[in-house]
Amino acid sequence: MTQPTETEKAKIERACRRLVLHSAAANDRQDYAAFAELFSDDGVMRRPSGDPLRGREAIENAYASRPKDRITRHVCSNILIHVDSARTAHGTTYVALYSADASAEPDGHFGRPAAARVLVGEFEDRFELTEAGWRIAERSARFVMHT
């Protein structure tokens, strides 16, 4: 099997990095259908609590059951993508998770007060090239620390 060229590797890294960022944005918008669509058909999501979610429908349903009045912001950094082949890659991302209660009154132009606890965690992702393009094949999310 021929290894990807440096240009091809850069394109794969960019596609996978965009998946990470789009997954955070879709999650924060509470657009769980769009979030699930970023996974492969048989994608697996492992969260810090609960059993693994297998398949897009299970991922979407689990996230859609979250409280609607919870505002979140997943701030992603240190996104490192490693290209394994022309069809697979893996990566890690640091995540700071902020949340707030949507029913709380905004504090002037500063928005709603954030919860006192900030969670810091990691995503470990495995990516694969599908007929629809690059998708998350497997994500393991874990918390490392909190305030």
What are the residue ranges of the model-derived segments?
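Short, surface-exposed loop/helix-turn segments at secondary-structure junctions
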Residues: 103-112
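Short, low-complexity N-terminal intrinsically disordered segments enriched in polar/charged residues
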Residues: 1-33, 37, 41
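Short beta-strand edge/turn micro-motifs at domain boundaries
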Residues: 2, 90, 114-147
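Charge-dense, low-complexity intrinsically disordered segments
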Residues: 6, 10, 53, 114
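A solvent-exposed, acidic/Ser-Thr-rich amphipathic alpha-helical stretch
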Residues: 32-102
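Short, conserved clusters of charged catalytic residues that mark active-site
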Residues: 18, 76, 122
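Soluble or luminal CAZymes and related metallo-dependent hydrolases
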Residues: 15, 73, 119
